[in-house]
Amino acid sequence: MTLPTDPAANLAALIRCASVTPAEGGALGALETMLKPLGFLVDRPVFSEDGTPDIENLYARRSGNGPHLMFAGHTDVVPVGDEAAWTHPPFAAEIANGEMYGRGAVDMKGGIACFVAAIARHVENNGGPKGSVSLLITGDEEGPAINGTVKLLEWAASRGEKWDASIVGEPTNPDTLGDMIKIGRRGSLSGSITVNGRQGHAAYPQLADNPVRGLMGLVDALLHPVFDKGTKDFQPTNLEVTSIDVGNPATNVIPAKATATFNIRFNDTWTAETVQAEIHNRLDQAAKRKKYRPGKKTPVDYDLVWRDRPSHVFLTRDDKLVDTLAGSIKAAVGKEPTLSTSGGTSDARFIKDYCPVVEFGLVGKTMHMVDERVALADLETLTRIYQRFIEDWFGQG
């Protein structure tokens, strides 16, 4: 029996599945075909929720006596954009100049392909890990992330699954393989502020109440002063205004409403609840000020709506997990990886509630771009890193 020990062949099979979120596109089926010869039992539960597409997921486990390691990731990919702009077709897995092209090559079908190859080599050389290995793979990471990892974890846990550690195979390296392990993530929270004014003629502002003026004062209060100066493990908390809309095409009309949307990435100085309280306090205080609304006697009339669910800040302090992975990276590429909490959120934010989790995968330079691609040499190196990690974490090195 031929085992899936070649990461490039594994990746090609996955790229050729057009699994643009939320479509499964055959990617989970291709993955199941790779895993079954390795002794994995595979389930593919489908989760639903009103107003969202049904999502197929995959949970596979190879059982043994000992600790339980989970590899997590996703097979769904972002849209390709203008397909004519691609040098090579986005779902053909063509190779040129030592690189494989295709949507999902680095984010993150490549990571999955390498982990499968690493397990296959370990089975071939050592008979398998002294413990259990599972793959928790969703088709809903690039989408709303409602019917994916969060529900798959709940589903598996309800069936008695427990994990001792997890690696998420997201592309964590900025420039070269081995640059960075993600050992935590900042929290994330989004909201919208709508200021209610009174529409009127721009030439007669005394007869109107310009909501844009009120909104300027509220936004200013969100941006100043800074929330903090950062901590030992995290960057400073940062708030970005991501949109401002008045829905007003006329230049001589004061609008009736103005809305600003914002996102805040917060460090371990805060919780989602304390960030929300701070923002409420800043807005309430700013609403009373007259700086942008001279002559107005009443506070700014505003509504604040929190959007989506917050992502909570976390930091993984599991020395065995972090040190074993860092040691595997150094053995393969000869350098110490940076331990970082930078960047955006990932599905690790859900996994951290079940077991210690870190993230490590390929180089992310071309993710989500036209001509997304990965060096074949990086696929081989990442496979060797994962294989060394599996051997050492299970005490078989």
Swiss-Prot record:
Its EC number is 3.5.1.18. It comes from Mesorhizobium japonicum (strain LMG 29417 / CECT 9101 / MAFF 303099) (Mesorhizobium loti (strain MAFF 303099)). It catalyses: N-succinyl-(2S,6S)-2,6-diaminopimelate + H2O = (2S,6S)-2,6-diaminopimelate + succinate. Its cofactor is Zn(2+); Co(2+). The keyword Transmembrane does not apply. Pathway: Amino-acid biosynthesis; L-lysine biosynthesis via DAP pathway; LL-2,6-diaminopimelate from (S)-tetrahydrodipicolinate (succinylase route): step 3/3. Binds 2 Zn(2+) or Co(2+) ions per subunit. This is Succinyl-diaminopimelate desuccinylase. The active site is at D76, E141 (proton acceptor). Belongs to the peptidase M20A family. DapE subfamily. Zn(2+) 1 binds at H74, D107, E170.
